Design a protein with these regions (language model features):
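Primarily extracytoplasmic ectodomains and periplasmic/lumenal surface modules that are beta-strand-rich
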Residues: 63-66, 126-127, 180-182
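Short, glycine-/polar-rich solvent-exposed loops and beta-turns at beta-strand/coil boundaries
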Residues: 100-101, 154-158
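Bacterial N-terminal signal peptides
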Residues: 6-16
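Aromatic- and charge-enriched surface segment that lines or borders ligand/interaction sites
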Residues: 35, 45-50, 70-78, 107-151, ...
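Polar helix-capping/helix-linker motif
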Residues: 16, 91, 147-148
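N-terminal secretory signal peptides that target proteins for export/translocation
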Residues: 1-2
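Surface-exposed binding/hinge segments that line
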Residues: 156-182
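N-terminal lobe/hinge region of extracytoplasmic solute-binding protein
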Residues: 21-113, 143
Length: 182
């Protein structure tokens, strides 16, 4: 959830010469500088990697909650990175430090006036229980962190997001409070 919303802010900060056109990713230097084409795997990822098995991790200390955003309790170490998937993510390739590619989103569109950004979700995106990911889930997550029971960091961090709008079941638009030149 936190990573998803972080992606929203990061994308706001990226300059995009092809504003108003849905793209599979965003780059500080424009879509022509994206290394990967739509549907292409990262060079360091194996699409045929074996699936299944166990992951066992250890850490010092104890935890009392699995929700890293709530105020009460101690979260499990790195739970946010292990459980939540971001809407977009960065390539780990050298020479591509400011590029974001769709992870849960097939396309992203930054408005020409940079006051809104639209995510076109992958229709195949699912939760671990098999339920489809929808625009309602993005809205729920955004509204959830506005709750006073959640850490005030999130409300402050995402204060530039004025509102979020459901366009259809698989499209969501973020409206920003003001133009941000960065």
């Amino acid at each position: 959830m936190t990573n998803f919303l972080s992606s929203c802010i990061i994308l706001l900060l990226l300059a995009q010469p092809a504003w108003g056109t849905p793209q599979h990713g965003l780059s500080l230097y424009g879509p022509q500088d994206l290394k990967y084409k739509p549907g292409q795997n990262y060079k360091y990822a194996n699409p045929n990697a074996p699936k299944g098995g166990y992951l066992v991790l250890s850490d010092f200390g104890a935890f009392t909650k699995l929700n890293p955003a709530s105020l009460k309790g101690v979260p499990a170490p790195d739970i946010g990175q292990l459980v939540f998937q971001t809407a977009m993510d960065s390539s780990m390739d050298d020479g591509e430090p400011f590029s974001q590619y769709g992870n849960l989103v097939e396309k992203v569109e930054l408005a020409e006036d940079r006051l809104s950004m639209t995510y076109y979700l992958y229709k195949q995106a699912r939760f671990s229980d098999g339920h489809p990911l929808t625009a309602d889930d993005f809205i729920f997550s955004f509204n959830l962190i506005q709750d006073p029971e959640y850490h005030p960091f999130y409300k402050t961090y995402f204060k530039d997001i004025k509102s979020i709008e459901k366009i259809d079941a698989h499209t969501v638009r973020y409206h920003f409070a003001h133009y941000n030149q960065e």
